[in-house]
Amino acid sequence: MKKNKSRSSSKKHFVGSEPGSRGKSVGLRIIGGKCRGTALEYSGDHRVRPMKDRVREAVFNLIGPDVRGRHVIDLFAGTGALAFEAISRGALSATVLEIHFPTAEITRKNIDLLERRMPGCRESIHLITTDVFFWGQKIREQDPGYPHVNPAVLPPEIPWLVFCSPPYDFYVSRKEELLLLLKTLRETAPANSLFVIEADNRFHFEDLQVAISPRKRKSYPPAEVGLFYTGTAAGES
């Protein structure tokens, strides 16, 4: 698997000092589906911010059975909990993006944990250690050297489920890059693809320039979550 490095960090996950400072191990688990109850590896590193269990559960309650049959793209994956929750609940496959090599190794261990509960699922999960913004640039350029990182090579009839849960500060410090990344994916995604955006109250969902139903906007302080679909009336309902 080709691994790409970039000077810019797209890590959710980095809110502090140099790599190496670690917190104690903290519990993280799959909440629903075939792998329900599976404990995931997570170091407790203060620079890694997985979506809280209660928020993840609420998000998947909003998505409901619509998770099934989709290809998941987890943009700022960290431990991979969002992608793995979706796989457990019936998603077909996943592209998992993580820039930090030590964190990606933990994610790889979590794939092994899922494999024990769902034999064969490892083959459907593609972990890429790369900068998310660099990856998005390659998709915009339709770079033929990166077909393995480009979800556009998937069968066009398979809709996506895109999770965007970056460091909240990115909505301020890298706002334009984030909006461009999401615009690129929105324009590339098959019809009826579903985007799940987690931010805090510094971000205005109107900046996405998509219609999000009030029923698909939820607040779980400090998290604000919005869901929208592409290419169908569902995104406007």
Description of each model-found segment:
Residues M1-S237:
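Class I S-adenosyl-L-methionine-dependent methyltransferase catalytic core
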